Curated annotation (Swiss-Prot):
Subcellular location field: Cytoplasm
NCBIfam families reported for this sequence: fabZ, PRK00006.1
A GO cellular component annotation in the UniProt record: cytoplasm
CDD domains in UniProt: FabZ
Catalytic-site annotation from UniProt: 63
UniProt organism field: Xylella fastidiosa (strain 9a5c)
Keywords linked to the UniProt accession: Cytoplasm, Lipid A biosynthesis, Lipid biosynthesis, Lipid metabolism, Lyase
EC class: lyase
Protein name listed in UniProt: 3-hydroxyacyl-[acyl-carrier-protein] dehydratase FabZ
Entry-linked InterPro entries: FabA_FabZ (IPR013114), FabZ (IPR010084), HotDog_dom_sf (IPR029069)
GO molecular function: (3R)-hydroxyacyl-[acyl-carrier-protein] dehydratase activity
Encoding gene (name): fabZ
Length: 160
């Protein structure tokens, strides 16, 4: 894989930092759950991203104060956001697509291990198919090489 993935009009160097991620995704604190893009293979429709899990995450105040655990639904959301970066890069013209993507379906979600403060969550997403404005993905989240969660995720794009 090349260190410089390309889109129609943009050349990107890996890793892709948070500034570029914010240009591609509408999410902001406290709901931006992707910190860095480590790998991008547009031919294989695959992206690998990173989420640094910190004790400073607002959800740890209530989930659970005595035993902080990242909520599984936020792990799935982080996977979807990684897929969103890949989709925006594949569709973009001059670095931004006119579509805004929403998660519309999650199937076969599995949570194998808790994600806790200090973990580095690696988000591996592959687009399985695209039908008009719908994208179907498979994602795995890993910590230290071990799959902690996986799911099939469907997103729909609407004009922004």
């Amino acid at each position: 894989m090349s260190d410089s993935p390309t889109t129609a009009h943009t050349r990107l160097e890996l890793p892709i930092d948070i500034i570029k991620i914010q240009a591609l995704l509408p999410h902001r604190y406290p709901f931006l759950l992707v910190d860095r893009i480590l790998e991008l293979d547009q031919k294989q429709k695959r992206i690998v991203a990173q989420k640094n899990v910190s004790i400073n995450e607002p959800f740890f105040q209530g989930h659970f104060p005595e035993h902080p655990v990242m909520p599984g639904v936020l792990i799935i959301e982080a996977l979807a956001q990684a897929g969103g970066v890949m989709t925006q890069l594949n569709l973009s013209h001059n670095g931004h697509s006119s579509l805004l993507f929403y998660m519309v379906r999650v199937d076969n979600a599995r949570f194998n291990k808790q994600v806790v403060p200090g973990d580095i969550l690696i988000l591996d997403m592959t687009m399985k198919r695209r039908i008009r404005n719908m994208g179907c993905y498979y994602g795995e989240a890993r910590v230290n090489g071990e799959v902690v969660a996986c799911a099939d995720i469907m997103c729909a794009g609407v004009k922004s």
